[in-house]
């Protein structure tokens, strides 16, 4: 043990002596191989907790604060995709799908016809189903984009717009007039207000 300690002390002394007597030799260490290892973005399989968003095209990991900040950080610009940025402000797709599904389960397969028009019959199958509608509500920046994504008839789109306008203006009478009961008003209004607040009517 003592011999090992003496050897370590001797090696340290030799290294320090080299620094004193040959300073230029020590300073000649090539640090260029370390350049590039201090990126603000990380590549690889797993992302760090402070850079949890992985770009789908190039496996670059970026901070959540860099999403939708106006400057692309992913090679393909996915972090600035308008659908991604809209979905980030909206209720999660799962929450929207669950809400729509619960309305259908409670009130019948054609209940959402009151909101989305004639194509919303049969548990939204003509529109692609509950998940398709939930995704379109999440990703569509505006009601026009939503109508285009689901190929809504112009009359159905205008009806939906009038429903959203009623919610925005606090006109619960309009919602009652299309058959939404008092017991359902609170939930429907709460859900639609979330979309209105994120620019759905702009």
Curated annotation (Swiss-Prot):
Presence of the UniProt keyword Glycoprotein in the record: no
Domain LDL-receptor class A: 46-86
InterPro entries: IDLSRF-like_peptide, LDL_receptor-like_sf, LDLR_class-A_CS, LDrepeatLR_classA_rpt
Cross-referenced SUPFAM superfamilies: LDL receptor-like module
Signal peptide annotation: 1-28
Location (main, coarse): secreted
Gene3D superfamilies referenced in this protein's UniProt entry, alphabetically: 2.40.128.620
Localization annotation: Secreted
Protein name in the entry: Prohormone-4
